[in-house]
Amino acid sequence: MDIKINGITVGNDAPFVLFGGINVLEDLDSTLQTCAHYVEVTRKLGIPYIFKASFDKANRSSIHSYRGVGLEEGLKIFEKVKAEFGIPVITDVHEPHQCQPVAEVCDVIQLPAFLARQTDLVAAMAETGNVINIKKPQFLSPSQMKNIVEKFREAGNGKLILCERGSSFGYDNLVVDMLGFGVMKQTCGNLPVIFDVTHSLQTRDAGSAASGGRRAQALDLALAGMATRLAGLFLESHPDPKLAKCDGPSALPLHLLEDFLIRIKALDDLIKSQPILTIE
């Protein structure tokens, strides 16, 4: 089942779509700088592109951690991104009252993993009629995603994308079950499945409120996931990850973006040049 976003086809058998950008909006200049580089690289490589950023990181571990520029300022920045680059935008919401204002600016609304079972939020998101990206919670199995999908459908919106972002593996660690991509496709009617490689690289340190990360393994993990015939890749970057205000240890350094995507596209082209082989 394919989803259309401003002329971009998102489907498991279509060329992969990049949902990429920054973790959280820091200011207008850095946002435009990052987006401009993504646009330049993806146009050069012929990769469909949707810009990603959060206006608010509402689930930070510490009350003192940076959260973002807020809804009002965030929507102004997204409007400038769309006006300057002519590309679709995806962002996440955390409360029902945010859904309609976000839907008026952004093309895709994201349901955060920690909030994926919140019925009031699901209903408000569904009511917008926008395409929805559902992050798979770390605490749910891939097959349980069908319950969230059904909730959206019964609320009136079947324009859904499913996003893997790792599963809890004991304490303070995430792993990605590569078999889970196929399970989500099979149990959810072959909805588009994308892979958030950035957040799958997170680690936790019991002595710190900040997340750690393993960005050195980003390419290995991304290639492994994309080999399962996915609709897209979800990727966060930063011009200088050491200075990022959120999740810097998992962010891909912006200057490596082109070399990274060359490898992802080569694999995606190879996988999708072959017919699906069904093994019973």
From Swiss-Prot:
Keywords: Cytoplasm, Lipopolysaccharide biosynthesis, Transferase. GO terms for cellular component: cytoplasm. GO terms for biological process: keto-3-deoxy-D-manno-octulosonic acid biosynthetic process. Its main location: cytoplasm. InterPro entries: Aldolase_TIM, DAHP1/KDSA, KDO8P_synthase. SUPFAM superfamilies: Aldolase. Pathway: Carbohydrate biosynthesis; 3-deoxy-D-manno-octulosonate biosynthesis; 3-deoxy-D-manno-octulosonate from D-ribulose 5-phosphate: step 2/3; Bacterial outer membrane biogenesis; lipopolysaccharide biosynthesis. GO terms for molecular function: 3-deoxy-8-phosphooctulonate synthase activity. Disulfide bonds: none annotated. It comes from the Bacteria. It is found in: Cytoplasm. Its EC number is 2.5.1.55. The keyword Metal-binding does not apply. Gene3D superfamilies: Aldolase class I. It catalyses: D-arabinose 5-phosphate + phosphoenolpyruvate + H2O = 3-deoxy-alpha-D-manno-2-octulosonate-8-phosphate + phosphate. Belongs to the KdsA family. This is 2-dehydro-3-deoxyphosphooctonate aldolase.
